[in-house]
Design a protein with these regions (language model features):
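C-terminal/domain-terminus segments
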Residues: 134-171, 175-185
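General structural signal for secondary-structure boundaries
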Residues: 1-6, 17, 94-95, 100, ...
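Short, structured secondary-structure boundary patches
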Residues: 110, 176-178, 191-193
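Flexible, glycine/small-residue-enriched loop-and-beta-strand segment within the central core
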Residues: 42-54, 59-137, 166, 174-175
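Short acidic capping loops at alpha-helix termini that bridge into adjacent secondary structure
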Residues: 35, 56, 77, 125, ...
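Extended, small-residue-rich solenoid/repeat segments and analogous flexible loops
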Residues: 1-46
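S-adenosyl-L-methionine-dependent methyltransferase catalytic module, highlighting the catalytic core
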Residues: 184-192
Length: 193
């Protein structure tokens, strides 16, 4: 190991300690935080923690951006993220004449009594999102799915999908119907033990 590698490792210690110290505080601010959740709050960007739910055993890495607006973000159990995921449950209204986009109020996001610019994001259990994935408002990613690195997910996908691209498209299903049944049976047996 050369001196540069040693210095790099030493420089990570303060960040790690700050994250370790503040993680319990941030977890208490969440709508729900399961057991064994790993987050790096001081090296990530979280907004709207009161609208964020994270299931047991999920790991949210440093460099994450999660913006929960008036719509919730729900992340299931045992979800894996590669570096720098982005999850945003809201959007800006851009169609108001004579008004800067930055000046649009929350009340102005409502059309006929419905906020169409903020919609929930749901990432179900056992999903793996690769590096630099972006998941936008109104999306549900079905359990057991895989999201390829760099994907921008703008619509929902069923369980056991493998998706990728900009915008994300279905690449293929992870398992056949028979394999899904066997996989879920095996997982159910593990849960009983």
């Amino acid at each position: 190991m050369n001196i540069f590698q040693i210095l790099q490792k030493i420089s990570l210690v303060p960040s790690y300690l700050w994250d370790k110290m503040w993680a319990p505080v941030w977890k208490r601010c969440m709508k729900h935080c399961g057991k064994g959740v790993y987050i790096r709050p001081m090296s990530s960007d979280f907004k709207g923690l009161w609208n964020l739910s994270v299931g047991d055993g999920t790991s949210i890495p440093k460099g994450s951006t999660i913006y929960c607006t008036d719509a919730p973000c729900t992340i299931g159990k045992k979800v894996l993220f590669g570096p720098k995921p982005t999850i945003i449950s809201g959007d800006h209204r851009i169609d108001l004449l004579g008004k800067y986009i930055a000046d649009v109020t929350v009340e102005e996001k409502f059309v006929d009594g419905v906020n169409v610019y903020d919609q929930p994001v749901v990432i179900e259990d056992d999903v793996w999102c690769g590096a630099n994935v972006t998941i936008l408002k109104g999306v549900t990613i079905g359990h057991g799915s895989v999201v390829a690195a760099g994907a921008v997910v703008t619509k929902s996908f069923p369980p056991y999908s493998i998706i990728g691209g900009i915008p994300a498209k279905l690449i293929k299903m992870r398992f056949t119907e028979e394999e899904i049944m066997e996989h879920e049976r095996m997982l159910a047996v593990k849960c009983v033990k």
